Curated annotation (Swiss-Prot):
It catalyses: uridine(1911/1915/1917) in 23S rRNA = pseudouridine(1911/1915/1917) in 23S rRNA. It comes from the Bacteria. This is Ribosomal large subunit pseudouridine synthase D. One of its GO terms (cellular component) is cytoplasm. One of its GO terms (biological process) is enzyme-directed rRNA pseudouridine synthesis. Its EC number is 5.4.99.23. It comes from Ralstonia nicotianae (strain ATCC BAA-1114 / GMI1000). The active site is at 171.
Amino acid sequence: MSDDAVADLPAASQDADDTLDDEALDLSAPGAGQAIEPIIVEIPEALHGERLDKALAKLLPDYSRSRLQQWIDAGAVRVGGAAVRPRAAVCGGDRIEVVPQRADDENAFVAEPVDLDVVYEDDTLLVINKPAGLVVHPAAGNWSGTVLNGLLHRYPQAAGLPRAGIVHRLDKETSGLMVVARTLPAQTDLVRQLQARTVKRTYLALVWGETPEAGTIDAPIGRDPRDRTRMAIIETASGKPARTHFKTLDVVDLGRAQVSLVQCQLETGRTHQIRVHFESEGHPLLGDPVYTRNFRRGRPQTIKAPLPAPFARQALHAVRLGLVHPASGQSVHWHAGVPDDLAELMDALEMDPDVDLV
């Protein structure tokens, strides 16, 4: 992970390369989760008959007229307790209440009731089982309804922590276990564990083709220069070291194609690491809408076939998490069985959703 992503953590942890994905935002601004106080203004006689938006632009010069118009349209500006249109004329003596609305990126700091599946909780840390479809922290296109917003709602004091205590993430459509710090010392400790690569993160993935019995994919990952929305194997200096260890637990034959169930152990935590690594080996994940190439130079193309059950996301689940508890110093671990959608697909493939990990 980039140093910029952890610049708001204590100095001892700023060299961590495994805390947040490379494009993570700094979500530790002070005042996170605080309510916005309304602004009350009275229209002077000199502005009698003026349009509401123009009058407010003169009385509240810190805000642009376009932003004020947006607030009026949103019903956040009231005259005498009633919402009005921007073109409405004001009268001298009118009492105007303006409730400033946060810009999209500011919603990153708003507490919202988001359903979090809590697997474990104490005064030091929290472990959640994130469902597919839930975004971890706000970013373009997903400014609200994230894990971070839910943390601020559940724990108001999390507003004082960098990123509300988040130290690592899962992709939106990846399900499974995440650990979140509840104190700054715990967050610092967890970042150091990630830096030392002692946090054990185990995933289950369904991939196309027959994978080797076991192996390690050691290939650097960086932003794809041909498509900046993708990550890719980058052999130049801009690629960051990435290692994924895997074991094949099961292989099924669909007639025209094969599907492998693999257990993955992350040594590093690059953006989209498992998805990129297995695509690079010619074994893209089932359901992955982005990393879909099914061939590797010098190897035959992996054949794909219709699945026996519909599946609308990448088949990836963070099934096991292990670390040293920041307060007790004891080794602890958690397990989260595969969610219903993945279990149904595995049943249809005649694989055991309760497969034993190795």
